[in-house]
């Protein structure tokens, strides 16, 4: 079901009902771009830490717009032994609803726009008829502004009402505006003496309208109604009407209802995300870190600077998430799934040993045909993401005793995959752990190398030719990480570079230590800067100045989101629906399928790096995630 600004209000109850009835939800987003950096390595380096990757994405990706959001709800029918699916495809655009609402700015990446255009994406549905939105802080500010305007009744850009409680003091009018205001008052005097019911004041500036409101508010505390309207030519002018007390109250009620409706319309698509969050349902995505970051950034609050704070916010907004790309990249799937891109994964899961899930579209909802491959339509991508999850979850049922053909999303055997987001192209950290500390591989076989800008990948291979197979991961034009096959070779490589003039080699540990020292120095400088500022404030007796940190989830979250939920927020999910013993094959962990994509082409065959998550499933199940001894 396609949803734009035109039908959003009418379809909102259907969306709410679908979310409420669902067992789990699948989401996907389409963006105006991916990275504003000069190359892919700006966003992805094979030896990023989770903190570095988060910082890069926050810096280089959040200025793009999430302008299409796909939501598929899946509800299991026990009687028919099949899922019923409801698909929604939202077109989103931050159109300001009045002059006080945020006028957002975003950037586009030409390659992304060209790609979507070639896929048949209809940009008119975004830019002409996209659903608006506000985050929590923007909504709060606008509500406060409405309350202020209502209490002040000065209405520079909205309606105002002259009431018995109006100001009793004269208005101070600048000399250059007195002639204009005197003419308006003279016209109003004549208007009150004749039989006309309303009169228009010619278009004027916002400041002049404010003076008109204040003057009439003082001179005529009863009997007239003043409002600002906008013509078809976008000209704003004042209309003055004669009213009695009963009519004034009716107009006041109409005004308040209109304001509430306008604000609800402005909140727009954010109401969908709030409903998803409040439901506590499992949210499934594919390679979904960017989807989660953009969703929080656009519809809830600004992203925090620190990764741990981002995890807290994410757990608050989405108590349970599952990434199908990570699921397909780990035991027991990684030995039988070789390509984890969404389209290829969906095809692979139709073949043995997997079984295609039974999924029908609910009555009145669009059905998709996977043979037509409507990829990069967010609703379709969300749909096949849900199919992939169902197939892999049901496959886990074959390890139960006795085996089960259907595995619920609430099953204990699925829980080890919760709240872990796939990290692209990081060689030895396959996922971001939203529930605790991230994996910390030793990387004692990794070197940090700096060299002249003219060097290419072949120069690095030649430099390390004596050390066998290596892996190169570019950082920028003059530095890269080089991974050796044997950790004991690291010190030899460092020693050979002591007298080199054109390049420098240091261990990964030395590189991290130096980087941390620089960060601490910058932090200390910032703290000292605040101290100097405070001393200057006291010396010059300025007003108290309190530095404010960006608001993450305190003020910008509605009360229902302010408290971190339990990881099982739904009452009926407190107990698992499967208690059978779980048997899994113990396989040696292998590379989860991440491929390094550096700044320059590399023509060597990479070695596999052991990388598998350490968590285990609940309730006596065997280990699905394994950790190499070197971690």
Swiss-Prot record:
Q: InterPro entries of this UniProt entry? A: CAF1_poly(A)_ribonucleases (IPR051181), Nucleotide-bd_a/b_plait_sf (IPR012677), PARN_R3H (IPR034042), PolyA-riboNase_RNA-binding (IPR014789), R3H_dom (IPR001374), R3H_dom_sf (IPR036867), RBD_domain_sf (IPR035979), RNase_CAF1 (IPR006941)
Per UniProt, a divalent metal cation binds at 28, 30, 291, 381
Q: Where is this region: Disordered?
A: 147-173, 568-631
Which cofactors are named for this entry? a divalent metal cation
Q: Which UniProt keywords apply?
A: Cytoplasm, Exonuclease, Hydrolase, Meiosis, Metal-binding, Nuclease, Nucleus, RNA-binding
Q: What's this chain's function?
A: 3'-exoribonuclease that has a preference for poly(A) tails of mRNAs, thereby efficiently degrading poly(A) tails. Exonucleolytic degradation of the poly(A) tail is often the first step in the decay of eukaryotic mRNAs. Required during meiotic maturation to silence certain maternal mRNAs translationally. Does not require an adenosine residue at the 3' end, however, the addition of 25 non-adenylate residues at the 3' terminus, or a 3' terminal phosphate is inhibitory.
Provide the reaction this enzyme catalyses: Exonucleolytic cleavage of poly(A) to 5'-AMP
Q: Name one GO biological process term.
A: nuclear-transcribed mRNA poly(A) tail shortening
Q: Where is this site: Interaction with poly(A)?
A: 325
Its chief place of residence is cytoplasm
The record's comment on protein family reads:
Belongs to the CAF1 family.
Tissue expression remark: In retina, it is constitutively present in most retinal cells, including the photoreceptors.
Q: How does it assemble?
A: Component of a complex at least composed of cpeb1, cpsf1, papd4/gld2, pabpc1/ePAB, parn and sympk.
PANTHER family per the UniProt record, alphabetical: POLY A -SPECIFIC RIBONUCLEASE/TARGET OF EGR1, MEMBER 1 (PTHR15092), POLY(A)-SPECIFIC RIBONUCLEASE PARN (PTHR15092:SF44)
Enzyme Commission number(s) from the entry:
3.1.13.4
The protein in question is named Poly(A)-specific ribonuclease PARN
Q: Which GO terms describe its cellular component?
A: cytoplasm; nucleus
Q: How is it modified after translation?
A: A 62 kDa form, which is produced by proteolytic cleavage, also exists.
Q: Which residues form the R3H domain?
A: 178-244
Q: Which GO terms fall under molecular function for this chain's record?
A: 3'-5'-RNA exonuclease activity; cation binding; metal ion binding; poly(A)-specific ribonuclease activity; RNA binding
Q: Where in the cell is it found?
A: Cytoplasm; Nucleus
- Biased-composition ranges, Polar residues, are 152-170
